[in-house]
């Protein structure tokens, strides 16, 4: 597992003040900051997962979702993750070929197939989770325990708001 550092923009020959200003003075301040943090959190981990396990983002997201919910359709996974349906469909085919998922007809909707994770898929998921936990800690270490609880409450509220 590689250690990913949150490098200062000054190391890339940028004026730190200008860099900080973009986070404070723009017309979509919260959106930009959330996007920045999300990218800093997940992109390095997905690069590591691709290098170490040969999995693309959609493929791992299938494992993640099916590790927590026993049966899902590809559309369910696309809806839960915000990933495009076509990237999830490609991921389903690859994960079926590699033996990480099984597929069966959906008795409620003949056009859909129900996906389940195999024991091999569960094991792969268990191997990958620590990579995310390490990266999460690298990002969240700037917060004390009260701030982490507050962040957790705020994120739960935003995710639960059912915003389109």
How would you name each of these model-derived features?
Residues 33, 44, 61-64, 123, ...:
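Pre-recognition alpha-helix immediately N-terminal to the DNA-recognition helix
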Residues 64, 90, 153:
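DNA-binding alpha-helical recognition surfaces that contact promoter or target DNA
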Residues 39, 64-68, 129, 156:
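Short, locally clustered residues in the helix-turn-helix/winged-helix DNA-binding domain
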Residues 74, 160-164:
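Alpha-helical transmembrane segments and membrane-interface helix-loop junctions
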Residues 1-53:
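N-terminal leader segment of winged-helix/HTH proteins
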Residues 9-17, 93-153:
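Charged, amphipathic alpha-helical coiled-coil/dimerization segments
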Residues 25, 42-87:
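N-terminal helix-turn-helix DNA-binding core of bacterial DNA-binding proteins
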């Amino acid at each position: 597992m590689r250690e990913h550092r949150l490098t200062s923009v000054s190391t890339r020959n940028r004026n730190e003040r200008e860099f900080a200003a973009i986070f404070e003075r723009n017309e979509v301040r919260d959106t930009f900051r959330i996007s920045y943090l999300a990218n800093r959190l997940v992109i390095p981990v997905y690069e590591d997962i691709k290098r170490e396990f040969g999995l693309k983002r959609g493929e791992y997201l299938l494992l993640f979702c099916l590790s927590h919910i026993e049966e899902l359709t590809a559309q369910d996974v696309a809806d839960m993750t915000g990933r495009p349906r076509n990237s999830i469909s490609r991921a389903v085919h690859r994960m079926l070929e590699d033996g990480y998922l099984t597929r069966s007809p959906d008795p409620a909707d003949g056009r859909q197939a129900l996906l389940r994770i195999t024991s091999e898929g569960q094991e792969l998921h268990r191997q990958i989770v620590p990579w995310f936990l390490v990266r999460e800690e690298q990002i969240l270490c700037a917060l004390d325990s009260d701030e982490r609880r507050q962040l957790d409450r705020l994120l739960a509220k935003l995710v639960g708001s059912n915003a389109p």
